[in-house]
Amino acid sequence: MGDVEKQTEIREKKARNVMRELKIQKLCLNICVGEFGDRLTRAAKVLEQLTGQTPVFSKARYTVRTFGIRRNEKIAVHCTVRGPKAEEILEKGLKVKEYELYKENFSDTGNFGLGVQEHIDLGIK
């Protein structure tokens, strides 16, 4: 066996390694409006249309007078999606970003985050 054949065999063996496969455990979606009211309700509806699940409302941890936020006031909605639905939503999100992410989007532990300005880009009206 030559060196080239040996190297290609090693590459193929690495490619078949189960530990190199990407696995999506969960997808956490979050919309923070910063105030309670109509905008928060609309954000909850958008998240419900996107995931098919009822989102959970998040409360402010402490009062921030400059932003007009009071402690325990509902200011955001979030939802956790798992399984094939998570893969489908992630595919839509990456398509909006044109499958390009920065190195800074990834953490050392294998997580990554991305933001989408308009939910209409995801195919939700």
From Swiss-Prot:
UniProt entry tagged with the keyword Cytoplasm: yes
InterPro entries documented for this protein: Ribosomal_uL5, Ribosomal_uL5_C, Ribosomal_uL5_CS, Ribosomal_uL5_dom_sf, Ribosomal_uL5_N
Gene3D superfamilies recorded: 3.30.1440.10
Pfam families: Ribosomal_L5, Ribosomal_L5_C
GO cellular component: cytoplasm; nucleus; ribonucleoprotein complex; ribosome
Tagged with keyword Cell membrane: no
GO terms classed as biological process: translation
Keywords, in A-Z order: Cytoplasm, Nucleus, Ribonucleoprotein, Ribosomal protein, RNA-binding, rRNA-binding
Domain of life per record: Eukaryota
Chain segments annotated as coiled-coil in the UniProt record: none
Protein's job: Component of the ribosome, a large ribonucleoprotein complex responsible for the synthesis of proteins in the cell. The small ribosomal subunit (SSU) binds messenger RNAs (mRNAs) and translates the encoded message by selecting cognate aminoacyl-transfer RNA (tRNA) molecules. The large subunit (LSU) contains the ribosomal catalytic site termed the peptidyl transferase center (PTC), which catalyzes the formation of peptide bonds, thereby polymerizing the amino acids delivered by tRNAs into a polypeptide chain.
Entry similarity comment: Belongs to the universal ribosomal protein uL5 family.
Quaternary structure and partners: Component of the large ribosomal subunit.
Protein's recorded name: Large ribosomal subunit protein uL5
Native organism: Toxocara canis (Canine roundworm)
